[in-house]
Amino acid sequence: MGRTDFNPEWYGAQAKVLTSNEDQMVVDYGCNGRGIVKSYKLFDGIQLCFLDFETDESMKAQKFNPDIIQVTHCQTGRYECEFTNHTVAYLPKGYFSIAATAYLPASFSFPLGKYYGVSLVIDRQALSEETRRIMQTIPINLDKIGATLGLETRWYVSDTPPQLQHLFLELYTAVEAETTGYFKIKALELLYHMEQLTRVNGCD
């Protein structure tokens, strides 16, 4: 049985793998207090990560591949980011964000001392032809999502609409209860809604 890839550049030298198999991996982030990241490999280039933190530590952002899109939802706590231009943005409870490698924070923290959320991470350089074919049948244009939302120059943050709130709740409920196949279906559903968001923003 293979193992889900662990990229130390994404987590930092202090992180360590607790468990790993071909479908999922649990990583201890190595921060003060608690920092657990549970990731599911869904498709080549796409993974779903549940983040469970209880820490007052401010952490430097790690190095990521140059063409990543990340959809994040905050279920509990608050996620705060400082960017290289010293501006600060935060993701409060009940909100979601979409970010790209071109505009990622220099550091992040959890001002309330806790955070529980989920992130869908798309590494467009790692997408296989099979993954792209699956997306095209829906259709979902992953290249279009980043360009139309202006992710090269900003961090897109929004209150979560009811249909997305329901979807995120299903993801949280499914942890430890459902197989990776279930998360694949929900990831496609989430990406479908991101495609619709692109259209709403009038960028066709």
Model-flagged regions — what are they?
Residues 2-7, 47, 67, 160-167:
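Alpha-helical structural motif
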Residues 5, 50-60, 121-130:
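Short N-terminal signal/transit or membrane-insertion segments
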Residues 17-116:
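N-terminal functional module of multi-domain proteins
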